[in-house]
Amino acid sequence: LPNYGVFDEFRYFAPGDGLTLFEFGDTLFGVTICEDMWQPGPPATDLALAGAQLIVNISASPFHLLRDREREEMFRTRARDNATFVAFCNTVGGQDELIFDGHSLVIDDEGTVLARGPGFEEALVVIDVDPSSVVARRLTDTRRRALAQDRGDLGPVATIHVGSPHEHTDSVTA
């Protein structure tokens, strides 16, 4: 997490001491925050090795000229490297001297952009994905086997069930 310039993330966040996956139906996903995915390796790699088929990156990445293209290429690379879908969800709007430009993305495990949010306006990007391609790709990826061997034991992995696309709950009004 960034802790420089205008960012003071250690005021709000602390590094985790384990991995957490979320289970939604047949899909396992992991969550990263902002700069967690700016470089190859953990935590994204560890989440993928633990079984995440989708990595959600929540971010408040400020606008700089051409930054949206740089981020897109970076997330396309992370998706390919980890054989995971990536959903990059960026903030939109202003805070103090910062402007956040959105440009959220959904990318498949081969690095293809499947959906793109607009720049400088709020939007809800909804897309159906089939992460079963991740499983097939991982079975034939020799780099993944070598990486798993290099990383060794990932330690305990918590899995939290967050529902199913087929579950319905009654609404409650107060």
Task: Locate each region found by the language model.
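Enzyme catalytic cores with a strong preference for nitrogen-chemistry domains
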Residues: L1-A174
